[in-house]
Amino acid sequence: MKIFILVDALRSDYISQKNTPFLYNLSQKYYYIKKIKPSLGFCERSEIISGLKSEKTGFFTAIGKNKQKSEYIKMSKSMSILLDMVDSILKKIPVIRLFNKNLNWNKAFRKIINKILTKKHNAKMSSYKIPYRQLRNFYLTEDEINHFSKKFFNQSSLVNKILSKNISINNKAWTYLGKKNQMSENEVKKYLINKNKSQKNEFIFSYLGSLDVIGHKYGPQSKEMENELMKLDLFFKKLIKSNLNSTIIILGDHGMKTIKSYFNIEPHLKKIKYDLGLKINEDFNYFIDSTMCRIWIKDNFKKEDVINYFERQKELTENGAIISPKVSKKIYGDIIWLANEGVMVYPDFFHFNKPIGMHGYNNSLLKSQGTCIIYSPDGKNINIENENLSKINEIIMKDFV
């Protein structure tokens, strides 16, 4: 039996005698890649399964622009305008303390509307904090196609390679955006521990996301993170001791950086829209990710004007830079502005509260990188300093399947 565990945001420097003594000891005895470098963007799962960098897969961020693929294409314009008006009003109402909890009217409204819209449009993609007038343009990119179907990168797919070895696939504990029956962290842990009773020749894909959640909320070097790392370390100790005859692959797909400053890019977008006489959905759209701003412009001449604006504005050049369009397809934007390390674009289209930690920065930065430890019954200590995330696919098939 093979157990693959994607540990979201398991940063390379978290493996230490202080933070994770069991995992550190494991790294000194078995297969260990100290630093895992993901591709730029937010599509690590497709990189792992396909064995290809994001430039090859075409997956750059989780959400792209293609009106024909949007699940919200039939959403009425009048309803979108009304919802945006209500949303705008509620943003101005301050958060209040009620029954020992913070009541955020805008967040409550968004959650209710999201439930209604996803049900009405049978949508896998959440509406998040995307302006309702723009919602009908966007769709899930990485998770549009089931990663476990034969359509997903047939030749290079890790799934198809495993199946070709007559090993069955188990993805009950895996994750993807829009999954309705996602196991909780504790359910995944119990599920994997109990697998020691199984004699089935299978490859289990599983996911643990607590480090990512805590890293965003409290910061990657917080006390809460230290506590969670200790819990995780104890879990892996228990898991491996109960599955000594299994191969267990522990993969951290990326790191996490403490946010140093927050940058509101919306005033610049409003100015561009007004100065160039642009209209939302007609010749102008934008998407604000946590570490980047993506812009679509219909008119190529006005596109040059926008680029010139970004390159002239001191506030924009001090906080980030326009990156080459070669890194992604047009569905991700005609113009992509990437924030500097430690800068978060806020407000964005995802967060109601300011996070403390963030990822999605330059992938060559040490704190943006993950790690990998592979335990196998007959394993030897192999220590590799760094490797690309896309190579994990090949390593698993060559040495552990």
What are these language model-derived features?
Residues 52-219, 286-287, 297-300, 314-315, ...:
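His/Asp/Glu-rich, glycine-adjacent segments
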Residues 12-14, 42, 56-58, 119, ...:
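Short catalytic/ligand-binding loop motif for oxyanion handling, primarily in non-cytosolic enzymes
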Residues 256-294:
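Acidic/histidine-rich catalytic neighborhood
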Residues 3-6, 12, 22, 228-269, ...:
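Metal-dependent active-site segment of extracytoplasmic phospho-/sulfohydrolases and closely related
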